[in-house]
Amino acid sequence: MANIKSKQKRILTNEKSRQRNKSVRSAVRTEIRKFREAVAAGDKAAAEKQLRVASRALDKSVSKGVFHRNTAANKKSGMATAFNKMA
């Protein structure tokens, strides 16, 4: 543990942020995985719905500072491409 009071506080706040970011990141990954499963199953309606849900989750994570906006844009672009390639 750090000796300086401000560093002790930073350790606590960093841990809180880490836990919060971890849960948000996990939720986003879950939504992306559900989208990929829908695409793999060939279910266009479910994939379209899940694309919207995953894109929204990515946008929210960007506003919370979990993902960089370019990272989210790349992920959304990849999902849109995968969706458009569906027959």
Curated annotation (Swiss-Prot):
- List GO BP terms, alphabetically: translation
InterPro entries named among the record's database cross-references? Ribosomal_bS20, Ribosomal_bS20_sf
Report the Pfam families cross-referenced here: Ribosomal_S20p
For this UniProt entry, the molecular function terms from Gene Ontology, in alphabetical order, are: small ribosomal subunit rRNA binding; structural constituent of ribosome
Record keywords, A-Z: Ribonucleoprotein, Ribosomal protein, RNA-binding, rRNA-binding
**Biased composition, Basic residues: where in the chain?**
1-10
Q: What does this protein do?
A: Binds directly to 16S ribosomal RNA.
Name of the protein in question: Small ribosomal subunit protein bS20
What phylogenetic lineage does the species belong to?
Answer: Bacteria, Bacillati, Actinomycetota, Actinomycetes, Mycobacteriales
